[in-house]
């Protein structure tokens, strides 16, 4: 199952920013029950957010993030079916939206397609698991755990193989779980193999062209160091009152996930913009091979992406992740500092770096201050499975995938320990 990450980014009429914010604030009060965009009816959807961004020197804009199953067209059809009136109401606040008293399907979908922004780099934590499969496997695990609790309570435990046979018989007896026996791979062979082949090909091309690339690389390093030593120093940022506003959309009760939207200004000049595009391309190449639930050792990212917007003048970063903001940033600093610094060292007010990837985020307090300063208030955020972590989803899939496979006693013990 292919998953798609994208945003619809539109300008907002300055005179209607307050109206749009009020509309979104009403949605946020009951995200799952709101009538504007009834998110639970969108069965292809994993995560979504709406952010109104106001920044000096830029028109106010609306960032509508979508992470969903399959290609764009079926998702747009589903979105129109369940949310046409609400989308019409939202985008009526945008100056280039076709004015009409009621939504016109062709115009609305054409408008959304015209404002699609695809990511320059992205990561998916649970590759190949559709939203439907995620819900199904979680329900299966809960049911099997209850069944096993009953077996233990009856004192009828027996050998491990016997317990597993009872579990299999239970699943076969439940009409609700007829789907469980037919396991589709998380990825096809080509989906798993091609990103690795692309990485190898890129390495071979670099090796073959090394006589040409090495002199160019030396020139680039000299230009980089000159740029780093002559740029204006980053502002001395501190965690300001903006944090009080940001945390209103963090650490909700009974939700194990969080959301972050971060918009930075790219440092001026073709050199910095070109370097950032190259870094994002490399990050994306590596991220395509990170299909085991982790990105650079970080096991908490559901969907995340970077997009260059406003003709490359700003960098958008959006992430749906497990745990707190503080722990998430600490994970990045501890486990992915080089990649993190390689990207954001090309943006304004990031902690000072050397050779693109040194220092930077390793100055943890300054990095966190910069991250907060560039973070945008999330007006609306929706998760289709807000109580599941990346690791829980992977564990649920492993339970289902090994349910009817042949296992020895050691593997059976490991399988039962997953509950």
Regions found by a protein language model. Give the residues of each.
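Elongated alpha-helical scaffolds
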Residues: 39-81, 85-90, 299-304, 308-319, ...
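Short S/T/G/P-rich N-terminal loop/turn motif that feeds into the first structured element of a domain
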Residues: 1-46, 59, 67-72, 107-302, ...
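An exposed acidic His-Trp-rich patch
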Residues: 74-128, 321-376
């Amino acid at each position: 199952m292919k998953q798609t990450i994208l945003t619809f980014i539109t300008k907002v009429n300055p005179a209607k920013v307050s109206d749009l914010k009020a509309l979104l604030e009403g949605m946020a009060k009951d995200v799952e029950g709101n009538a504007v965009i009834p998110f639970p009816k969108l069965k292809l959807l994993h995560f979504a957010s709406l952010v109104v961004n106001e920044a000096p020197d830029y028109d106010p804009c609306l960032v509508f993030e979508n992470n969903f199953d399959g290609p764009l067209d079926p998702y747009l059809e589903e979105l129109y079916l369940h949310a046409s009136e609400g989308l019409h109401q939202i985008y009526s606040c945008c100056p280039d939206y076709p004015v009409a008293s009621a939504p016109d399907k062709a115009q609305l979908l054409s408008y959304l397609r015209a404002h699609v922004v695809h990511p320059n780099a992205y990561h998916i934590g649970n590759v190949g698991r559709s939203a439907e499969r995620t819900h199904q496997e979680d329900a299966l695990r809960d049911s099997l755990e209850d069944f096993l609790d009953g077996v233990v309570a009856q004192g009828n435990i027996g050998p491990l193989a016997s317990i597993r046979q009872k579990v299999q018989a239970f699943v076969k007896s439940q009409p609700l779980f007829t789907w469980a026996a037919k396991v589709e791979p998380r990825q096809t062979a080509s989906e798993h193999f091609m990103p690795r082949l692309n990485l190898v090909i890129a390495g071979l091309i670099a090796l073959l062209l090394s006589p040409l690339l090495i002199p160019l690389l030396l020139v680039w390093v000299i230009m980089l160091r000159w740029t780093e030593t002559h740029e204006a120093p980053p502002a001395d940022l501190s965690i300001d009152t903006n944090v009080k506003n940001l945390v209103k959309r963090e650490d909700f009760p009974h939700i194990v996930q969080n959301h972050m939207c971060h918009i930075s200004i790219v440092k001026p000049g073709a050199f910095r913009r070109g370097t950032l595009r190259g870094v994002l391309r490399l990050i994306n190449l590596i991220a395509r091979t990170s299909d085991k639930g982790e990105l650079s050792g970080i096991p908490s990212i559901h969907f995340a992406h970077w997009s260059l917007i406003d003709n490359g003048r700003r960098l958008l970063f959006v992430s749906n992740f497990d745990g707190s903001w503080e722990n998430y940033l600490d994970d990045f600093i501890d486990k992915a500092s080089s990649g993190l610094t390689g990207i954001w060292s090309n943006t304004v007010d990031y902690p000072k770096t050397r050779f693109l990837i040194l220092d930077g985020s390793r100055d943890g307090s300054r990095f966190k201050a910069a991250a907060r300063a560039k973070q945008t208030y999330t007006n609306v955020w929706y998760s289709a499975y807000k109580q599941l972590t990346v690791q829980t989803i992977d564990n649920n899939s492993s339970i289902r995938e090994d349910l009817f496979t042949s296992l020895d006693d050691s593997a059976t013990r490991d399988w039962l320990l997953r509950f």
